[in-house]
């Protein structure tokens, strides 16, 4: 058994199986676990997926939103225990794998057309 196969078999135990299918351009709501003191709560973070990186357990999505007029981007490890839930709010129709051009746009220019051929 090769080393790469051993690593994949160990990582397979920690992969989440209940993740929805996410594509670039989708609007998602990510529930992030935050522990303050002795309490734990789930904070929602909603935005547009502008990038995805595949790679087994290190699979990530970059989510962008506008907060108080400032663009905020956050990278989430999909299989991390910090992420409680991911829900797709809206499907987006884009023709790029990375939507970094949205960083330079302001206001209504950042809108993405809705896609109806994929179910939520």
UniProtKB/Swiss-Prot annotation:
Pfam families: Ribosomal_L19. Belongs to the bacterial ribosomal protein bL19 family. Keywords: Ribonucleoprotein, Ribosomal protein. GO terms for biological process: translation. It comes from Rippkaea orientalis (strain PCC 8801 / RF-1). PROSITE patterns: RIBOSOMAL_L19. This is Large ribosomal subunit protein bL19. The gene is rplS. One of its GO terms (molecular function) is structural constituent of ribosome. This protein is located at the 30S-50S ribosomal subunit interface and may play a role in the structure and function of the aminoacyl-tRNA binding site. InterPro entries: Ribosomal_bL19, Ribosomal_bL19_CS, Ribosomal_bL19_sf, Translation_prot_SH3-like_sf. GO terms for cellular component: cytosolic large ribosomal subunit.
């Amino acid at each position: 058994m090769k080393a790469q196969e051993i690593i994949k078999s160990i990582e397979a135990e920690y992969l989440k199986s209940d993740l929805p299918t996410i594509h670039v351009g989708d609007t998602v709501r990510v529930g992030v676990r935050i522990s303050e003191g002795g309490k734990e709560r789930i904070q929602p973070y909603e935005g547009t997926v502008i990038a995805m990186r595949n790679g087994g357990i290190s699979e990530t999505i970059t989510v962008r939103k506008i907060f108080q007029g400032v663009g905020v981007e956050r990278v989430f490890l999909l299989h991390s225990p910090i992420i409680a839930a991911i829900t797709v709010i809206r499907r987006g129709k884009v023709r790029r794998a990375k939507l970094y051009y949205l960083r330079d746009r302001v206001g209504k220019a950042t809108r993405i057309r809705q896609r109806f051929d994929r179910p939520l």
